[in-house]
């Protein structure tokens, strides 16, 4: 798919998109059939989030095929070429708010409280269950509005999607945080990343309401896309990795403490710098002039530098924890215990 896009071979791109869609459909069907038996539990709603995400990946892959044909096929029908921007917006909605959003939203229902080292809110499953059909229906409405060129319909659909995400994921996380707030870098990154995604979604809804057509929406939302990626999705990934990596490496409590200690180095400064830089970048995005350009550049340098530090610390933390794990396994006490 990617190779076809880079080489302008639209047949290869469509083939790749078809394969991706078919695999996603297969995966979704497997989850659906398994969830009725082996995965049936109190948390089965999380699996339903993943099934819905797989559905929207199929939709996004299908739309990607049409967009590719509109872009690269000289013999594409006129109606398809004219619908390119509308289909692109619908494709983005299915991919970001559907596939990525539903996957991360469902995961955060359980991962968020776990990273905060507290219990899930007693009503978390109820909130997530109530929000899912609202999320899916509103996203279908938003996508339909995009395809038909009705930006107001897209705006309303997006706003309801944001509300559903806030209800199903945000409210339970906040209620859990009120019991025991985030105290570690991973938990803070997860919470702030989720907050930025909701902000970006609300911004997209506003831009859609103001836009005259899909082309105008694409242009107006360009300033928000880096924020969605760097401040939203990026922080979610970093937060998940920061919490999960020490757990996966293991080695016992002492080894885990070594890894966590490295990952927590300068955590408040990194978190503050990243999010203040994101706020600054968003605030000056609509301004013009040399000063605004310099502020924007400085903000992005700081923001990206925090991720560079994250990468370095993840590497150092993994190495340090692995060494502590090996040292613990080869200590005389451990060896003696094994012989006994």
Where do the language-model regions lie?
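Hydrophobic alpha-helical transmembrane segments of multi-pass integral membrane proteins
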Residues: 1-340
């Amino acid at each position: 798919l990617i190779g076809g896009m880079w080489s302008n071979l639209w047949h290869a791109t469509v083939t790749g998109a078809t394969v991706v869609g078919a695999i996603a459909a297969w995966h979704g069907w497997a989850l659906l059939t398994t969830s009725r038996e082996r995965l049936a539990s109190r948390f089965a709603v999380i699996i339903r989030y993943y099934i819905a995400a797989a559905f929207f990946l199929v939709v996004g892959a299908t739309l990607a095929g049409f967009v590719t044909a509109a872009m690269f096929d000289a013999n594409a029908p006129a109606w398809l070429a004219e619908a390119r921007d509308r289909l692109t917006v619908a494709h983005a909605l299915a991919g970001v708010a559907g596939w990525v959003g539903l996957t991360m939203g469902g995961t955060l229902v359980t991962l968020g409280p776990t990273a905060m080292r507290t219990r899930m809110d007693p009503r978390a499953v109820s909130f997530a269950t109530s929000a899912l059909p609202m999320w899916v229906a509103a996203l279908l409405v938003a996508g339909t509005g995009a395809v038909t060129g009705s930006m107001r319909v897209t705006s309303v659909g997006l706003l309801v999607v944001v509300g559903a995400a806030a209800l199903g994921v945000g409210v339970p996380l906040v209620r859990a945080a009120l019991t025991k707030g985030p105290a570690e870098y991973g938990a803070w990154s997860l919470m702030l990343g989720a907050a930025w995604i909701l902000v970006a979604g609300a911004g997209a809804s506003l831009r859609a309401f103001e836009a005259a057509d899909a082309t105008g929406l694409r242009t107006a939302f360009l300033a928000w896309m880096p924020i969605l990626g760097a401040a939203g999705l990026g922080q979610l990934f970093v937060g998940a990795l920061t919490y999960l990596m020490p757990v996966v490496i293991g080695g016992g409590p002492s080894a885990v403490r070594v890894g966590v200690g490295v990952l927590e180095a300068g955590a408040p400064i990194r978190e503050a710098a990243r999010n203040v830089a994101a706020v600054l970048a968003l605030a000056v995005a609509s301004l013009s002039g040399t000063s605004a350009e310099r502020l924007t550049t400085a903000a992005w340098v700081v923001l990206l530098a925090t991720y560079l530090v994250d990468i370095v610390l993840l590497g150092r933390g993994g190495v340090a924890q692995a060494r502590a794990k090996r040292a613990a396994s080869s200590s005389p006490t451990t060896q003696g215990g094994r012989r006994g």
